[in-house]
Curated annotation (Swiss-Prot):
Residues 56-68 have a biased composition (Basic and acidic residues). Keywords: ATP-binding, DNA damage, DNA repair, DNA-binding, Nucleotide-binding. This is DNA mismatch repair protein MutS. The keyword rRNA-binding does not apply. ATP binds at G714, P715, N716, A717, S718, G719, K720, S721. PANTHER family: DNA MISMATCH REPAIR PROTEIN MSH1, MITOCHONDRIAL, DNA MISMATCH REPAIR PROTEIN MUTS FAMILY MEMBER. One of its GO terms (molecular function) is ATP binding. PROSITE patterns: DNA_MISMATCH_REPAIR_2. The gene is mutS. Transmembrane segments: none annotated. Residues 1-88 are annotated as: Disordered. Belongs to the DNA mismatch repair MutS family. One of its GO terms (cellular component) is cytosol.
Length: 900
């Protein structure tokens, strides 16, 4: 469809980020200045009634526009004006003066300023942009007294990619877009900030990880004072999915642990500290004003956002710090999310996270167990999530990740999940049928959020309709097979009836494959709106006139090769070859000369062109109005869509776990009250998948029923650390409701899992390896209970041998005696085997090895009894230590043993 005309009365455009700008929806439909005066709305409606249009879905491809800047390059390494504050704004050109005014309001953000087909930035932002994104640093004339100022820019059509890179690097971006296409006489184009992008508030699909939540968090701190402990309130929201949760606790370590678990993309705080101890190093801390975090401002923000008369129903008045954090978060959202009219960021009512809802996993344990990323390089492959994730949808992937990061402690809830997994394992046909329905589903959670915020495109709405239409099919498959399931499953089995009506409305209104652009038409089916049909009938008449005109001009000119064509810049024209150009009729007017052809217009063609442009503008405007109405309908049901989406996500996670269990020879663990942890032929869920040429050696473990501490000895590199980790991973898998890699399992619920596996220097904190190891051990001894699972891989290695042995012995005694925590302690201190002679709840186990001459064969088999040797010298030889060094080591060992 032709592009917009150059008519100065053309409809104003709204700023819209990464697609063509959307036309403003006026209150009366079409501005009088743009209406084709020959056809009133009544006449067009009557035309549609007399010539009804039939639905004819068709594919439309959005045009991709590439443009080049005309600014000259400036390769200076030291720009004259490296910061906007160095310049007197009154000496700048009007455009740059406006830029500096906006920059002063957003000094902490990269300001991108729309100029034609580019987003440009100037001064320090231009320097930053050119360095980070490897763009050419150019210059622009800033005024007679200023000269050229630094400039860098990105094409409008590539803005999402470049902004996404800035967001990933931790920057926030303010976008200033054009709010009109033609300025008033003697004035600049109207521009303003239309969107602020920050790591925690983005909604664009290309800037989000599809399979993990993008949390924005806010924290309020009350430091310890006299007899008052350190207290904190935390609010977190995923703007893209609408999930909101709040909590209030004590203890800075608990806050550090919670923030590490959450992994927020952005953390808001009004604390003056630049690097507080309670904030994990990897988090992005955004400093904000303290006013929005005050109690009155926070209450007002909550009442306004949720449209409430009071806050009693939310349960937040009893959590004053969490309430203040939530208010500050909402204020930040309001400042960074300029929304379309009748749109809002659809956030759920805050869910209060209670203490004891989830198994506690500190940051060290998460790293050691490699739940979602490997320790070596932080990649997904090789993690537990990689090994068990068979989900088919993005929302299902996020759901499974949340389950892994916060395993349940409620035995009934765990059993409900496990029963569903068992049903899906046993009923293979049901599982496969559900997975076929799940595979093509879009991300309903985030699509609904974009619709509610007024950012969704036509293709987003079509994807929503497709997903909603699958809900009854999923429910029908589950009917009769689910006896008792979690409450969230009801949103799938008994969905909101309005959702199917909404899907039908989307299908009735939108083409199956609409274009990306919302401003150029081609969105709406024929037969949906009489006024639109009338406009399309008139456009068909104009097309017929153009076809007839081409035939007439061919006859008049005697040129059978003449073509009537259209160009977005030049409009309609008659094209003839160079050879025929001299014989054209006198009433033709030369429009353009090319290498091989000449282009002409006629007065009649020019007059008709204006009428066609007016009709097209009205038709496109009407399509946009109809689309916006439909988008508002979708946004109004965003909460219902998301509830259904959460149920689909949970079902996807369960079917994925069932698929993993069915293909991996897993078993359904017997979940019991108490402290039992009994595993037969248990395997490491990740390592067994990584092995190619060998089979994983399964092993048993029995804790909590007579034995509370296992002292595990054996050679270096024999598999002790793997054994420890597999026990922790199986405990965790059981508490998310999954089957586990074992022949048989009987598992009680753990309140925490602690690991101390390896240690490295923390040079930044001035701590040696030994001090890091002792700090981790102290944390375990302070917080472990008889319901905890403790996995220790060596203690006391970084100091003198007897000091280390003494510490290891005392720690073991405390764990087995005072705490009675279920513990597996892997060590090379063979003296610890004597603990079993002193305490009935301590048992010795070893990893077997087979000696054949100078060679060692690691059997990876765990057996009762303590090892007497570590075979460290043999392990050194296998690692490639030079032979003379190995031989000398044996001589020294013989001397030491003889002296002993």
């Amino acid at each position: 469809m032709p592009g917009p005309s150059d008519d100065p009365t053309e409809i104003a455009l709204q700023g819209n980020l990464f697609s063509d700008a959307e036309p403003t929806v006026s209150a009366t439909g079409v501005e009088p200045s743009t209406a084709c005066e020959a056809f009133s709305d009544m006449e067009l409606t009557a035309d549609a009634a007399s010539r009804p249009r039939r639905r004819a879905p068709a594919d439309h491809n959005a045009a991709d526009h590439d443009s080049n800047t005309d600014e000259s390059s400036d390769n200076s390494d030291d720009p004259a004006w490296a910061h906007h504050s160095q310049v007197d704004p009154q000496q700048l050109t009007p455009m740059l003066r406006h830029y500096v005014e906006l920059k002063a309001a957003h000094p902490e953000r990269v300001l991108l300023y729309r100029l034609g087909d580019f987003f440009e930035c100037f001064f320090e932002d231009a320097i930053t942009l050119s360095r980070l994104l490897e763009l050419t640093l150019t210059g622009k004339e800033g005024g007679k007294a200023v000269g050229r100022v630094p400039m860098a820019g990105i094409p409008h059509h590539a803005a999402e990619r470049y902004c996404g890179e800035l967001i990933r690097r931790g920057f926030s971006v303010a976008l200033c877009d054009q709010l009109e296409t033609t300025p008033a006489k003697g004035a600049l184009l109207k521009r303003d900030i239309t969107r602020v992008l920050t790591p925690g508030t983005v909604l664009e699909e290309g800037m989000l990880s599809s399979r993990r939540n993008n949390w924005l968090a806010a924290v309020v701190i009350e430091p310890a004072h006299r007899d008052e402990p350190f207290r904190w309130g935390l609010a977190s929201a995923d703007v893209s999915t609408g999930e909101v949760q709040v909590m209030q606790r004590q203890d800075s370590d608990a806050l550090h642990q919670q923030l590490a678990q959450l992994g927020a993309a952005e953390l808001l705080s009004s604390t003056p500290e630049s690097n507080p101890a309670w904030c994990p190093d990897q988090l992005r801390l955004t400093s904000v004003a303290s006013t929005p975090f005050s109690r009155p401002a926070a209450e007002a923000a909550l009442l306004r956002h949720y449209k409430l008369a009071n806050l009693d129903g939310l349960g937040l008045p009893e959590l004053p710090l969490a309430l203040r954090a939530m208010g500050g978060l909402l204020a930040y959202l309001r400042d960074t999310q300029p929304l379309e009219e009748n749109a809002s960021v659809p956030l759920e009512v805050p869910a209060i996270v209670q203490r004891g809802d989830a198994l506690v996993l500190d940051a060290q344990t998460r790293r050691n167990l490699e739940l979602t990323a490997t320790q070596r390089d932080g990649s997904l492959q090789g993690s537990l999530l990689w090994a068990i994730d068979r989900t088919l949808t993005a929302m299902g992937g996020r759901c499974l990740r949340r389950w892994l990061e916060a395993p349940l402690m409620d035995l009934d809830a765990i059993r409900q999940r496990q029963q569903l997994v068992s049903t899906l394992v046993e009923q293979r046909n049901l599982r496969q049928a559900l997975r076929r329905l799940l595979r093509p589903m879009g991300d309903l959670e985030r699509l609904a959020g974009r619709a509610g915020a007024g950012h969704a495109g036509a293709r987003d709405l079509v994807a929503i309709a497709d997903g909603l239409e699958r809900l009854p099919q999923l429910a029908a498959r589950l009917e009769g097979t689910i006896i008792r399931g979690p409450d969230w499953l009801d949103d799938l089995l008994q969905p909101d009836p309005a959702l199917q009506d909404l899907a039908s409305s989307i299908r009735h209104t939108l083409l199956e494959s609409p274009p990306l652009s919302l401003s150029e038409g081609g969105l709406i089916h024929d037969g949906v709106d009489p006024l639109l049909d009338g406009l399309r009938n008139q456009l068909d008449d104009q097309d017929a006139w153009l076809s007839q005109q081409e035939k007439q001009e061919r006859q008049r000119s005697g040129n059978s090769n003449l073509r009537l064509q259209y160009h977005r810049t030049f409009g309609y024209f008659l094209a003839v070859s160079k050879a025929k150009a001299s014989a054209v009729p006198d009433h033709w007017i030369r429009r353009q000369t090319l290498a091989n052809e000449e282009r002409f217009i006629t007065p009649a063609l020019k007059e008709r062109e204006g009428r066609i442009f007016q009709l097209r503008a009205r038709a496109c405007q009407r399509e946009y109005e109809l689309f916006c109405t439909l988008r508002e309908q979708v946004g109004a049901l965003a909460a219902s869509i998301r509830r259904a989406a959460r149920a689909v996500a949970g079902l996807d996670a369960l079917t994925g776990l069932a698929d993993t269990a069915a293909s991996g020879a897993y078993c359904a663990p017997e979940l019991v009250e108490g402290r039992a942890l009994s595993l037969s032929e248990a395997r490491h869920p990740v390592v067994e998948q990584l092995l190619v040429e060998t089979r994983f050696t399964a092993n048993d473990v029995h804790l909590g029923s007579g034995t509370d501490l296992v002292v595990l000895t054996g050679p270096n590199a024999s598999g002790k650390s793997c054994y420890l980790r597999q026990i922790g991973l199986i405990q965790l898998l059981a508490q998310i409701g999954s089957w586990v890699p074992a022949a048989k399992a009987r598992i009680g619920i753990a309140d925490r899992i602690f690991t101390r596996v390896g240690a490295v220097d923390d040079l930044a904190a001035g701590q040696s390896t030994f001090m890091v190891e002792m700090a981790e051990t102290a944390n375990i001894l302070h917080h472990a209970t008889e319901l905890s699972l403790v996995l220790l891989d060596e203690i006391g290695r970084g100091t003198a041998t007897f000091d280390g042995l003494s510490i290891a012995w005392a720690v073991s005694e405390h764990l087995a005696g005072d705490l009675r925590a279920r513990t597996v302690f892997a060590t090379h201190y063979h003296e610890l085997n004597n603990l079993a002679n002193e305490r009935a709840n301590v048992a010795n186990f070893q990893v077997l090895v087979e000696e054949t001459g100078d060679d060692l064969l690691f059997l990876h088999r765990v057996s009762q009894g303590g090892a007497s040797r570590s075979y460290g010298i043999e392990a050194a030889r296998l690692a490639g230590v030079p032979t003379p060094v190995v031989q000398r080591a044996r001589q020294v060992l013989d001397q030491i043993e003889a002296a002993a």
